[in-house]
Amino acid sequence: MWIFGPPLAFTVVYYLVSLKVNGFTRDFDFAYHQELVRGWRPAVYPTVDVFLPVCGEPIEVLHNTWTHVRQLADRYPGRCVPFVLDDGASPELAAMARDFGFRYGTRENRGWFKKAGNLHYGFGQSDGKYILILDADFTPRSDLLEELLPYMEADERIGIVQSPQYFRVLDSQNWIERGAGAVQELFYRSVQVSRQGSDGAICVGSCAIYRRAALDTNGGTTLIEHSEDVHTGFDLRGLGWDLKYVPVALSTGVCPDTAGAFFNQQYRWCSGSMSLLGSKKFWEAPIRFSSRLCYMSGFFYYIHTALFTFVAPLVPIVLLLTSPEMLQVKHLVWVLPSIVYTAMIFPMWHKAPYRLEAWSARMMYGWAHVFAIWDILRKQRMGWQPTGSKGAKKNKTRRFWLGMWIWSGGTAVIWVGAAVYRLFTGYPPDFALVLSSGLFYALVVARALIQPKEHHAEVRPQELQTVGDTA
């Protein structure tokens, strides 16, 4: 059993860091938020540019988003200019932008620094005091600006105000969409709020307002081919600007609906964050220790999920095959608290339904993290693709499926088979729990292996929460 010592030691370190960062922190002061928003009535409202970067996303998704952006711009009392930044140079999108009354632009050096280069182009072609960035699949509430700009106007040291990326979980969605939406709630509802107290909330790009003066000090968005949002937020913090996280659901997004799109999204998020860990600037930036610890907690999370994609099924299998006496009923007292938390408390805490598909989504993103970290170590990172683009849905996922079928599927069979064998050859109550756990693990694997049928459902306008709801 000594072989599990290093990963378990890492787990202890990771949990201690997470406890330091996330434990015993203040909750979001929603009463103060309401007071601040109600009291913001400037004589002259600041100018705002709304950047809408696009790169091959379905036109029906864009039409849905732009409809809500038009409502946002019409509601705002000041000058609000939606600006379509098209890296696909689509004549259809240019015409649709004109129909909506939006500015439209496409750069000559398309592909240069991917999305970061596209945003950099928009930065140089606009002049609003503030910039709202919305990804192609995020529909904003019409009052988004009035909910976030008061923070900017109240504190001139704030460079970014970030709101959650909120996803609805509906029965009409396929299981990948439901699972992908459910697993995001913990980060935006709890983790980001806790990190805000340590000045360590991260920028996630979409659904955020940027101060142009802050971006000026950085030369615009950070030029990098992946995760420019995380890097831009970190770089601005290093330049002395603050980031404010406001956990109020002001926009809603569309989750990936295929394994390829979900794998691509999770791979991109992991590789972007982990690239920061390996950069010289992360260790040299003049930021608070508590802020750096928040980023470290995120790095440890990705490493932990990748590591335990392999370790988690091995522990019960090794115990069943080599040390069945350690699974006696009298030892259950040590694992019951963890089982109760995992099976009951954690799912019940979520507002979104946290069902089998959420656990399958967790298994899938574990493999995405495995390959992202592996590719970083061998310096062969996959190219960037937008989550909702056609390319993302055709993403090469052969190694992901090999991992799912051979490792996850294989360990599920061995786990259940070994537990059944011990059940019939030993004292049944000793092995009932490990068999039940193995059956659940097998169900999670089976759910991930049975993919939903592709469909082309009509994109419906997103239902958004009321002003009083927090993420």
Locate the predicted segments by residue.
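Basic/Trp-rich segment in TM-proximal cytosolic loops or flexible interdomain/linker regions
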Residues: 20-39, 198, 259, 269-431
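Short, acidic, metal-binding catalytic loop of nucleotide-sugar glycosyltransferases
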Residues: 65-79
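A conserved acidic beta->alpha catalytic loop
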Residues: 85-93, 109
